[in-house]
Amino acid sequence: MPLDFNEIRQLLTTIAQTDIAEVTLKSDDFELTVRKAVGVNNSVVPVVTAPLSGVVGSGLPSAIPIVAHAAPSPSPEPGTSRAADHAVTSSGSQPGAKIIDQKLAEVASPMVGTFYRAPAPGEAVFVEVGDRIRQGQTVCIIEAMKLMNEIEADVSGQVIEILVQNGEPVEYNQPLMRIKPD
């Protein structure tokens, strides 16, 4: 029995509000896997295997098994502080250019999805480390629900570091790259 859009949306909302890092739904006709980025080491710990109806509610078929994994609490790297977690963003609580210190800004993911450095496989990447970029320039793509969303730089400057590998899943507001503003 295929899921409709509202059932998938309800499932994604439920997952986003928990510490579940990965969910896989399987039936005869399809398989759906949802993963969240879970920190520096990207390890997950299995927690529960239960029928789907016990996790989400009565809107989904109960014959589909669900496997859930808890996301570990991210621990800071030795010698670093969590100050970047409390940095002020340039547009309130919206993702975008986050000033991580007086010299660097971060481009953050505005959504959960998959990070891509190029517009298509085999094509040139949008930016490389060391490139000079301008405000509004496309720096990457985040694929979310089969839609390609171009992510633009909120500041002009030089790309100092790209924090995510091509094809990796990203979380909402996850830093993607660091820029030294002009």
Swiss-Prot record:
<dbReference type="GO" id="GO:0009317">
    <property type="term" value="C:acetyl-CoA carboxylase complex"/>
</dbReference>
<keyword id="KW-0276">Fatty acid metabolism</keyword>
<comment type="pathway">
    <text>Lipid metabolism; fatty acid biosynthesis.</text>
</comment>
<keyword id="KW-0444">Lipid biosynthesis</keyword>
<dbReference type="GO" id="GO:0006633">
    <property type="term" value="P:fatty acid biosynthetic process"/>
</dbReference>
<dbReference type="InterPro" id="IPR001882">
    <property type="entry name" value="Biotin_BS"/>
</dbReference>
<keyword id="KW-0443">Lipid metabolism</keyword>
<comment type="subunit">
    <text>Homodimer.</text>
</comment>
<dbReference type="InterPro" id="IPR000089">
    <property type="entry name" value="Biotin_lipoyl"/>
</dbReference>
<keyword id="KW-0275">Fatty acid biosynthesis</keyword>
<protein>
    <recommendedName>
        <fullName>Biotin carboxyl carrier protein of acetyl-CoA carboxylase</fullName>
    </recommendedName>
</protein>
<dbReference type="GO" id="GO:0003989">
    <property type="term" value="F:acetyl-CoA carboxylase activity"/>
</dbReference>
<dbReference type="InterPro" id="IPR053217">
    <property type="entry name" value="ACC_Biotin_Carrier"/>
</dbReference>
<feature type="region of interest" description="Disordered">
    <location>
        <begin position="70"/>
        <end position="95"/>
    </location>
</feature>
<feature type="domain" description="Biotinyl-binding">
    <location>
        <begin position="104"/>
        <end position="180"/>
    </location>
</feature>
<dbReference type="Pfam" id="PF00364">
    <property type="entry name" value="Biotin_lipoyl"/>
</dbReference>
<dbReference type="InterPro" id="IPR001249">
    <property type="entry name" value="AcCoA_biotinCC"/>
</dbReference>
<dbReference type="InterPro" id="IPR011053">
    <property type="entry name" value="Single_hybrid_motif"/>
</dbReference>
<feature type="modified residue" description="N6-biotinyllysine">
    <location>
        <position position="146"/>
    </location>
</feature>
<comment type="function">
    <text>This protein is a component of the acetyl coenzyme A carboxylase complex; first, biotin carboxylase catalyzes the carboxylation of the carrier protein and then the transcarboxylase transfers the carboxyl group to form malonyl-CoA.</text>
</comment>
<keyword id="KW-0092">Biotin</keyword>
